[in-house]
């Protein structure tokens, strides 16, 4: 998919986060920007190519785990994609204040991304969570922006 309106069928078929058990990867070069490997979009994983979509659809790996964590975060936001995306955008907007200190601050200091990156290599992380929900983002959301920045810098070194 490379046209902006081709995303409409995905929206039409969107289901509540709790009703999705296996996210399907779909190739979309329009909505997925350079520098990003994948994007969770209303229960689908958008990737750059059909080959990558097939690879993700056929096995669980760290990238699919990262995106599945976002699915479970949406479940923890009242089982609503709209609440999840609203909170995501608010966190992103607030974290932009640190953009002079770190590139892509809105993304990297977003509590949802911090939880997903912290646990993406642990393929059993979600299995250990109550009800399979990912709520670690709430701990990051309670931190100040400076505390999140310090934590991010510690993890990078």
Q: Which residues make up each language-model segment?
A:
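Short, solvent-exposed loop/turn segments at secondary-structure junctions
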Residues: 30-31, 51-53, 69, 78-79, ...
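Short charge-dense sequence patches
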Residues: 11-17, 63-72
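General "foldedness" signal
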Residues: 58-59, 77, 85, 130
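Metalloprotease/metallohydrolase-associated module, dominated by Zn2+-dependent proteases
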Residues: 2-36, 40, 82-157
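Short pre-active-site segment immediately N-terminal to the catalytic Zn-binding motif
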Residues: 37-38, 45-65, 107-108
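Catalytic Zn2+-binding segment of zinc metalloproteases
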Residues: 68-87
């Amino acid at each position: 998919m490379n046209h902006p309106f081709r995303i409409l069928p995905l929206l039409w078929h969107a289901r509540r986060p709790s009703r999705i058990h296996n996210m399907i990867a779909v190739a979309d070069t329009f909505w997925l920007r350079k520098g990003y490997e994948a994007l969770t979009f209303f229960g689908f994983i958008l990737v750059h190519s059909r080959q990558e979509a097939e690879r993700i659809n056929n096995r669980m790996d760290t990238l699919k785990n990262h995106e599945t964590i976002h699915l479970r975060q949406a479940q923890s936001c009242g089982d609503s994609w709209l609440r999840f995306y609203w909170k995501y955008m608010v966190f992103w907007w607030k974290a932009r204040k640190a953009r002079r200190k770190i590139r892509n601050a809105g993304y990297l200091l977003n509590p949802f991304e911090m939880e997903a990156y912290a646990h993406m290599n642990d393929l059993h992380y979600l299995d250990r969570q109550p009800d399979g929900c990912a709520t670690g983002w709430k701990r990051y959301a309670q931190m100040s922006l400076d505390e999140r920045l310090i934590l991010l810098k510690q993890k990078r070194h």
